[in-house]
Amino acid sequence: MSDDYDPTNINAASWEEQEDYGEADGSEQYGEAEGSEQQDIQHSSEHQEAEYSVESNPNDLGDHPSQDGNTDDVGDDYDPASVVTSSVPAPPSAPAQEDSKTAPQPAAPVAKKPRTAGGFLVGDSDDEDEDGDDDGEPQQQQQQQQQQQPHQVVHKETGSGASSSGGSAPAPASASATAAPQSHSPAPQTATLTVQDNAGATTFNAPPVPQQVSHQSGATTAAVPTTPSSAAPAVDPTPVTQPAPDRVAIYEDQIRDDPRGAMNAWLELMKEKRARNDIDGARQVYERFLAIFPQAADIWVEYLDLELSLNNFPQAEGIFAKCLMTTPNVNLWTRYLDYIRRRNDLNDSTGQARQTVSQAYEFVIDNIGLDKDSGKIWAEYIQFIKFGPGTVGGSQWQDQQKMDQLRKAYQRAICVPISNVNTLWKEYDQFEMGLNKLTGRKYLSEKSPSYMSAKSANTALEHITRGLNRTNLPRLPPAPGFDGDQEFMEQVEIWKKWIAWEKSDPLDLKDDKDQPGLYQKRILYVYNQALMALRFWPEMWVDAAQWCFDNNITTVENKVTKDGNANGVEFLIRGIEANPESVLLAFKHADHIESTYPIEENDEAKIQRGEAVKAPYNKVLDTLYAMIKSLKEKEAAQIAKLQEMTAAQESKAGSDNEDGDGAADNIKKAPIEAIQKGYAAQTQLLSRMISFVWIALIRAMRRVQGKGGLNVPLGGMRKAFHDARARGRLTSDVYAAVAQLEWTIYKDPAGGKIFDRGAKLFPEDENFTLENIKYLHSRDDHTNARVLFETVVNRLTQKPELVHKAKPLYQYFHKYESQFGELAQVTKLEKRMAELFPEDPKLAAFTARYASDKFDPITARIIVSPTTQLRPKNMIMPSIEQQQPQLPMSQRDTPAAGFSPRPQGLKSPSAGPGAPFAPYAAKRPLDDRDYDDHPRKIARSEHDPFVRGASPLKGAAGRRLDQQRRMGGAAGAYSGSGAGSQVAPIARDITFLLSQIPRVEFYDSHRLNPSRMVSLLQNVKVPEYLDWKRERERMQQMQQMQGDGYGGYGGGGGGGGGGGYQGGGHARNISQDYAYRESPGPLGGRPLSPFTGGPGSRLASATAAYRQAPVGRPESSGSYEPPPAAQYGVPPPAQYDGGWAQQQQQQQYGQPPAPQGYRYGNPPPPY
């Protein structure tokens, strides 16, 4: 076949007829075709540059000539442009716009009086004498003209079409677009509303319009003047407000431009139709919408409500027939149940109606009873059975039948993970135990595992679907990086988690023999639910189809069978209908057809198989080509609209704007170029999509039908390549792929000719040139490879904007010369690369000589000294404050000392009167800026440095502290020293607490909100010292008064600091733990406890022996002190008002003395 195949010539049949390949290609014909194509597009070289239009760029698209004009090809009759059918003619301009452009528009300068007739401008006078004559016109004539104008408009609307005056003049060019049809064709007296769009005209008849309404509506229509233009002077006409555009027309325009993306326009249009009581129009809108969104259950429900509100039961049943089986939605199926119950009266004596409703319930539960939101339907079904004929527990056959139906319904419902499964289980328990406790326990024990599985599954399902939006109004997925992309992908991930959870079989249904196929049915149901929300996400369609193929699963009449092809293909077909532009779905469908189609050796079977495989490819190609055509139409419309607006602005400005023509032209061209660039980017993306679809089709045809040819029944690969060139919009990838197939598989020299043709079409495509050089190297044609390399890189480097394209060519050729060439050639290439790409590292090219894709011997480091080169870095454990992100600097003022919730300590003598207090005798003056914002353990080097004074500690403690500071020990963290400082160790109690807290990945309980916890601690009210002292004294006085009423305390305290009773007193002595509890007052003047003897004291004299005893508090913060034994003593009898209340009262206000030797900062504030 290599002798008679010309891949570059569409019409030629053999290579022998065209021996001059590469020398003559009919450039004259191509030039004519190219000119004709440009004529169709109506893009002039003076106003539009080629690089802004992908269609006119020969370097990026299909079979087009090179820029140098050389279009060598095989045959004289070969015309690549003649087979490219992707050119889009410019849309014809509207007649009204043509009139506005061709008709003369008189100018009306401000300084001159315009000449008008009938309220419209008809001329302009530059002569002062004429203006004087106009001023002499009587004012009555103007009033008569103004009175006659509405009358003429009414006549035009009522169909007379003739003016009362004899003369008539054409309407001025500035008239609105709606005036043209009124002036040429009379309108009927009955008003007709016509909404005109590209799809057609939709006409709605309305009642006759009164004449007054016509008069008002016709005020904006150009009236026929009754007098000549020079008759009356011009009085400035009052500006007439244009009527607001019809909302229906606006919504229709949005839907026409973007039917799948204008969801809000669809919804508003339906709402508007219903508000206007336009039933027929609403039906049409519903049908159009549901053709695009066939699983929009909410819109189906609205459509049903519309028909049922009009009692159109046949139409409602037709709607149910269309949507019920394809839309598994609980709300929609609930409406079906409501309709069945509405049409069947349960009071029927024959019982036929109840039987129909019962069958409807069974039908609904079989289809959507698996839904996690179907609990209401299950509950209604059980109630329907309960209120049926018969008595539960009776002995009649009807009673027994009712009992069996209830038991069956309960046993089915409690196995489904629904929200009310607990309620249904309780009802089932009562039902069984009410009949017979012995048999009831048996049934309950049998169904208890299923119920527990359903209960736990419902909990897990609620956790998985938290945040899921189960919408049935799908939206197009936002592009990555644009608004809504993260939210959309989050919804996709939640659906995937739900599907994966169902596949994990949490209900143990895979091996359930009582319910065969229920496991597969649940998974298919979740896939259908996901596709209702993700209709425009092709990956979900492919995932569902692939699962059916892998598991050989499908459903026939709601029963699972073992024929997965039907259901999987159905998913693919439905996905392609929803996403006709999806390349993924097309490839998957074609791949499945190719792998499952029967294989036979005869030519007829191969032809049929090839046609079946080509069908998905052709469908997606048609869609992509149509999208490019639509883009070109939108581009032309936007440019025309922009030019029209620019022209209107220039006409308003007049001749006052006399700026330079060059600057004005640049300003006008800038927005047009921006529009062209935007559409060019979209068109380029679609062109690459089309090219890769053609590559996939060519490869598939080679597998199915072989190499093929143009004039043979089995076209194969070559016929597919011919069709691709005929349709156009190809990139260089197609030529490179076909050439590689020709040479790699068949060793046919046609591959080289395809490369030659591609080199002429894409002379500046670096990727295609790179593949061409590799092809020449594979044929050992090193000379031509070098020539091609030098030619292309010289062409690219001559243009500064294309220098970057030469880099991959240099890199490949440098690598090739390094491996197989001479050192002199390698050195020359490196010098050229250094001049062209100075930003690259100097050793990058030299290193690339000896490196491979797997290892680079130059950059790899050899370990000479492990002790020196492999020394681990010092890992310093950061403090708690360093582990947390640094808080921003506070913007508030430091609170005053008197209002601070901290314990009020003594101020430093060196501190000024306005300085904040230093808790517990600070050793140095503190900075008064942002005192509360610095973390306790933050490195002071990050803030203002300070000089620490001499330590007030003397003796051994002072020497130890000074030694630690000199050695850079723990004290360095507080002194703000440099790198030698170490972080202060964490207290043992805190370390123990942190060790008990589980790791975050293993903690699945309730999590505290840190910000709210900090806010709670900030809002805790800590009393001031003076207020606390005053309150304590008041409570002491109250306790003394109560003690005086019960009698005094005697001596002789009990063991363990308890104390004894004396006289009529009933209060026992307070233990030592609370007797020495102090207030959070200043350390300098520590008050004595009021409970330690003295006049008026209520304590027994035995407690005085413990006054001078040292406080039994440990010095270490990590030690533990057991409570005194008196705390665990036996309380006094209940009938006596003993000492427990007093002990609790003292416990509320008393505090133990704070230890003086805290090692890690100040003691905490009081409780």
Swiss-Prot record:
Residues 16-26, 70-79, 124-137 have a biased composition (Acidic residues). This is mRNA 3'-end-processing protein rna-14. GO terms for biological process: mRNA 3'-end processing; RNA 3'-end processing. It is found in: Nucleus; Cytoplasm. It holds the Pfam family Suf. Residues 924-946 have a biased composition (Basic and acidic residues). GO terms for molecular function: mRNA binding. It comes from the Eukaryota. Keywords: Cytoplasm, mRNA processing, Nucleus, Repeat. HAT repeats lie at residues 277-309, 311-342, 352-387, 401-434, 471-504, 518-550. InterPro entries: HAT, Rna14-like, Suf, TPR-like_helical_dom_sf. Residues 102-111, 138-150, 159-191, 219-245, 908-922, 1079-1090, 1135-1151 have a biased composition (Low complexity). GO terms for cellular component: cytoplasm; nucleus. Residues 192-218, 882-893 have a biased composition (Polar residues). Residues 969-979 have a biased composition (Gly residues). Component of the cleavage factor IA (CFIA) complex, which is involved in the endonucleolytic cleavage during polyadenylation-dependent pre-mRNA 3'-end formation. Residues 1121-1134 have a biased composition (Pro residues). Residues 1-245, 882-980, 1075-1167 are annotated as: Disordered. The gene is rna-14.
